Amino acid sequence: NLVIVLSGVIILYAFLSIYYLPPEDAVARVHDYLEGIFSVYKVRAELSGFFLDYDYTVQQIFNGVPLNLTGLSDFNVGANLYLFFDPFDAYVINQFLFRTIGFIGLLLLLKDHVLPKGSYYVLIAVSTALDFAVINHFPTRFGTILYQPLLYWSILNIYSGSRKLRDIMIIVAYPFM
């Protein structure tokens, strides 16, 4: 079973590596990111003094709109990647992060709560989770869709009686993703 899961992870990373490595020849999805939220991430990354200041006004965004109207949390992991990395690097790290979590989340959900036990069903779970992880979507709010199977897995674990700190931490961390 471990070989099947590791094969799925290797295929996922090979798929992501084709798109984003090497960086000078990257073929990241073709979109006009200037019309979306990515320009807000870039402007926010160049600001200082905005942390937990809900009235912080940015002149470069919609002619002086307060930063809190953009819907960006100061604790959002994905948005804060743009503070520490260049925009392309932050985008690539975010893609690897939320697609990996999406793969693991759906794999755990299918393996533990949906499919019966057995190596054949692990193969079905890995291939379905791999399909889910590489699904094409526009990641404006980072992993909101791809994190849901992991959240649902944690809720089902608590509901079934195997309450662990890990499950509670996943539920608490979900709004910050």
Stretch-by-stretch model annotation:
Residues 8, 79, 157:
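Charged/polar, solvent-exposed surface patches and flexible loops
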Residues 1-6, 116-119, 163-165:
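N-terminal membrane topogenic signal
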Residues 11-106, 131, 142-144:
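Membrane-interface coil-to-helix junctions
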Residues 4, 92-96, 119-126:
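Alpha-helical transmembrane segments of integral membrane proteins
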Residues 103-109, 119-159, 164-177:
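Membrane-embedded helix bundles of polyisoprenyl
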